Amino acid sequence: MSFSPLIRQLIDALRTLPGVGQKTAQRMALQLLERDRSGGVRLAQALSLAMEGVGHCRQCRTLTEQELCPQCADTRRDDTQLCVVEGPMDVYAVEQTGYRGRYFVLKGHLSPLDGLGPDAIGVPQLMARIEEQGSFTEVILATNPTVEGEATAHYIAQLLAEKGLVASRIAHGVPLGGELELVDGGTLAHAFAGRKPISL
Protein backbone atom coordinates (compact mmCIF):
# COMPACT_ATOMS: atom_id res chain seq x y z
CA MET A 1 0.00 0.00 0.00
CA SER A 2 1.30 3.41 -0.93
CA PHE A 3 0.53 6.20 1.54
CA SER A 4 0.05 9.85 0.64
CA PRO A 5 2.95 12.23 1.35
CA LEU A 6 1.33 13.65 4.53
CA ILE A 7 0.59 10.19 5.93
CA ARG A 8 4.14 9.03 5.09
CA GLN A 9 5.48 12.12 6.89
CA LEU A 10 3.37 11.28 9.98
CA ILE A 11 4.54 7.65 9.94
CA ASP A 12 8.18 8.71 9.65
CA ALA A 13 7.74 11.16 12.53
CA LEU A 14 6.19 8.47 14.76
CA ARG A 15 9.09 6.12 13.97
CA THR A 16 11.47 8.49 15.77
CA LEU A 17 9.95 7.32 19.07
CA PRO A 18 11.89 4.56 20.88
CA GLY A 19 10.59 1.07 20.16
CA VAL A 20 8.30 2.19 17.34
CA GLY A 21 8.96 0.44 14.05
CA GLN A 22 7.35 0.82 10.63
CA LYS A 23 4.24 -1.30 11.30
CA THR A 24 3.55 0.22 14.73
CA ALA A 25 3.97 3.72 13.31
CA GLN A 26 1.53 2.89 10.51
CA ARG A 27 -1.05 1.58 13.01
CA MET A 28 -0.63 4.68 15.19
CA ALA A 29 -0.99 7.06 12.25
CA LEU A 30 -4.07 5.32 10.90
CA GLN A 31 -5.64 5.12 14.38
CA LEU A 32 -5.23 8.87 14.85
CA LEU A 33 -6.49 9.71 11.36
CA GLU A 34 -9.39 7.23 11.27
CA ARG A 35 -10.64 7.02 14.85
CA ASP A 36 -9.15 9.73 17.07
CA ARG A 37 -8.54 12.98 15.23
CA SER A 38 -9.19 15.06 18.37
CA GLY A 39 -6.61 12.92 20.21
CA GLY A 40 -4.17 13.52 17.37
CA VAL A 41 -4.70 17.27 17.60
CA ARG A 42 -4.19 17.16 21.41
CA LEU A 43 -1.02 15.11 20.89
CA ALA A 44 0.32 17.58 18.33
CA GLN A 45 -0.44 20.57 20.58
CA ALA A 46 1.10 18.93 23.68
CA LEU A 47 4.19 17.92 21.71
CA SER A 48 4.59 21.42 20.28
CA LEU A 49 4.20 23.06 23.71
CA ALA A 50 6.65 20.62 25.33
CA MET A 51 9.26 21.08 22.62
CA GLU A 52 9.08 24.86 23.03
CA GLY A 53 8.64 25.06 26.81
CA VAL A 54 10.79 22.28 28.28
CA GLY A 55 14.52 22.78 28.64
CA HIS A 56 17.31 21.69 30.98
CA CYS A 57 17.88 22.74 34.58
CA ARG A 58 20.96 24.96 34.74
CA GLN A 59 22.30 23.06 37.79
CA CYS A 60 21.51 19.37 37.36
CA ARG A 61 20.57 19.24 33.65
CA THR A 62 17.30 17.34 34.08
CA LEU A 63 14.25 18.36 32.07
CA THR A 64 12.26 21.29 33.45
CA GLU A 65 10.09 24.22 32.43
CA GLN A 66 11.93 26.61 34.77
CA GLU A 67 15.55 27.74 35.10
CA LEU A 68 15.87 25.37 38.09
CA CYS A 69 14.04 22.06 38.43
CA PRO A 70 11.96 21.45 41.60
CA GLN A 71 14.76 19.36 43.15
CA CYS A 72 17.42 22.04 42.65
CA ALA A 73 15.08 24.82 43.79
CA ASP A 74 14.23 22.97 47.04
CA THR A 75 16.41 24.46 49.81
CA ARG A 76 15.52 21.59 52.19
CA ARG A 77 17.45 18.99 50.22
CA ASP A 78 20.75 17.52 51.47
CA ASP A 79 23.64 19.53 50.01
CA THR A 80 26.23 16.93 51.06
CA GLN A 81 25.10 14.20 48.63
CA LEU A 82 25.18 14.32 44.84
CA CYS A 83 23.58 11.53 42.81
CA VAL A 84 24.90 11.15 39.25
CA VAL A 85 22.52 9.50 36.77
CA GLU A 86 22.55 8.87 33.02
CA GLY A 87 19.31 10.62 32.07
CA PRO A 88 16.26 12.55 33.27
CA MET A 89 14.08 9.42 33.64
CA ASP A 90 16.60 8.14 36.20
CA VAL A 91 15.96 11.22 38.38
CA TYR A 92 12.28 10.28 38.56
CA ALA A 93 13.17 6.68 39.41
CA VAL A 94 15.60 7.70 42.18
CA GLU A 95 13.07 10.16 43.63
CA GLN A 96 10.78 7.16 44.33
CA THR A 97 13.38 5.84 46.81
CA GLY A 98 13.08 8.82 49.14
CA TYR A 99 16.54 10.15 48.26
CA ARG A 100 16.77 13.80 49.36
CA GLY A 101 20.16 14.92 48.01
CA ARG A 102 21.12 16.73 44.84
CA TYR A 103 21.42 15.43 41.26
CA PHE A 104 23.58 15.69 38.18
CA VAL A 105 22.27 14.27 34.91
CA LEU A 106 24.82 13.00 32.39
CA LYS A 107 23.81 12.80 28.76
CA GLY A 108 24.14 9.03 28.63
CA HIS A 109 27.20 6.90 29.34
CA LEU A 110 30.71 6.53 27.98
CA SER A 111 30.65 4.67 24.69
CA PRO A 112 33.81 5.13 22.60
CA LEU A 113 32.39 3.03 19.76
CA ASP A 114 29.50 5.51 19.46
CA GLY A 115 31.81 8.52 19.79
CA LEU A 116 30.60 9.34 23.31
CA GLY A 117 33.56 10.38 25.44
CA PRO A 118 33.65 12.30 28.74
CA ASP A 119 33.02 15.68 27.07
CA ALA A 120 29.98 14.42 25.14
CA ILE A 121 28.18 13.18 28.27
CA GLY A 122 29.08 16.15 30.47
CA VAL A 123 31.84 14.90 32.79
CA PRO A 124 33.65 18.29 32.74
CA GLN A 125 30.39 20.01 33.78
CA LEU A 126 29.95 17.44 36.56
CA MET A 127 33.42 18.11 37.94
CA ALA A 128 32.85 21.87 37.70
CA ARG A 129 29.55 21.52 39.60
CA ILE A 130 31.27 19.53 42.36
CA GLU A 131 34.04 22.11 42.69
CA GLU A 132 31.66 25.10 42.61
CA GLN A 133 29.25 23.61 45.16
CA GLY A 134 32.06 22.63 47.51
CA SER A 135 29.69 20.97 50.02
CA PHE A 136 29.41 17.45 48.60
CA THR A 137 30.92 14.81 50.87
CA GLU A 138 29.57 11.86 48.87
CA VAL A 139 28.97 11.40 45.16
CA ILE A 140 26.59 8.51 44.47
CA LEU A 141 27.20 7.02 41.03
CA ALA A 142 23.81 5.69 39.96
CA THR A 143 24.61 4.94 36.34
CA ASN A 144 22.87 1.93 34.82
CA PRO A 145 24.33 -1.48 35.72
CA THR A 146 25.46 -2.14 32.15
CA VAL A 147 29.03 -2.51 30.89
CA GLU A 148 28.94 1.12 29.71
CA GLY A 149 27.35 2.33 32.94
CA GLU A 150 29.98 0.54 35.02
CA ALA A 151 32.78 2.00 32.88
CA THR A 152 31.29 5.48 33.29
CA ALA A 153 31.03 5.07 37.08
CA HIS A 154 34.60 3.80 37.30
CA TYR A 155 35.93 6.69 35.20
CA ILE A 156 34.13 9.30 37.31
CA ALA A 157 35.23 7.55 40.54
CA GLN A 158 38.86 7.84 39.43
CA LEU A 159 38.45 11.58 38.80
CA LEU A 160 36.81 12.03 42.21
CA ALA A 161 39.55 10.02 43.97
CA GLU A 162 42.16 12.36 42.48
CA LYS A 163 40.34 15.22 44.23
CA GLY A 164 40.02 13.31 47.51
CA LEU A 165 36.23 12.91 47.24
CA VAL A 166 34.23 9.85 48.28
CA ALA A 167 32.38 8.05 45.49
CA SER A 168 29.87 5.30 46.12
CA ARG A 169 28.05 3.03 43.70
CA ILE A 170 24.46 1.91 44.12
CA ALA A 171 24.26 -1.75 45.11
CA HIS A 172 23.29 -4.35 42.58
CA GLY A 173 19.74 -5.02 43.60
CA VAL A 174 19.18 -3.60 40.16
CA PRO A 175 19.54 -6.37 37.56
CA LEU A 176 22.76 -6.31 35.55
CA GLY A 177 22.00 -5.07 32.06
CA GLY A 178 18.85 -3.28 33.29
CA GLU A 179 17.94 0.39 33.17
CA LEU A 180 16.93 2.45 36.22
CA GLU A 181 13.76 3.85 34.68
CA LEU A 182 12.37 0.30 34.37
CA VAL A 183 13.14 -0.80 37.97
CA ASP A 184 10.41 -0.69 40.62
CA GLY A 185 10.81 1.71 43.55
CA GLY A 186 11.30 -1.01 46.19
CA THR A 187 14.18 -2.66 44.33
CA LEU A 188 15.80 0.69 43.69
CA ALA A 189 15.39 1.72 47.35
CA HIS A 190 17.12 -1.54 48.39
CA ALA A 191 19.93 -0.88 45.93
CA PHE A 192 20.40 2.64 47.30
CA ALA A 193 20.44 1.41 50.91
CA GLY A 194 23.15 -1.13 50.02
CA ARG A 195 25.46 1.19 48.09
CA LYS A 196 29.20 0.74 48.68
CA PRO A 197 32.30 2.85 48.08
CA ILE A 198 34.11 2.14 44.82
CA SER A 199 37.54 0.68 45.46
CA LEU A 200 40.17 1.71 42.97
Curated annotation (Swiss-Prot):
The keyword Zinc-finger applies. This is Recombination protein RecR. May play a role in DNA repair. It seems to be involved in an RecBC-independent recombinational process of DNA repair. It may act with RecF and RecO. A zinc finger (C4-type) spans 57-72. The keyword DNA damage applies. It comes from Pseudomonas putida (strain W619). Residues 80-175 form the Toprim domain. Pfam families: RecR_C, RecR_HhH, RecR_ZnF, Toprim_4. The lineage of its organism: Bacteria, Pseudomonadati, Pseudomonadota, Gammaproteobacteria, Pseudomonadales. Keywords: DNA damage, DNA recombination, DNA repair, Metal-binding, Zinc, Zinc-finger. Belongs to the RecR family. One of its GO terms (molecular function) is DNA binding. SMART domains: TOPRIM. GO terms for biological process: DNA recombination; DNA repair.
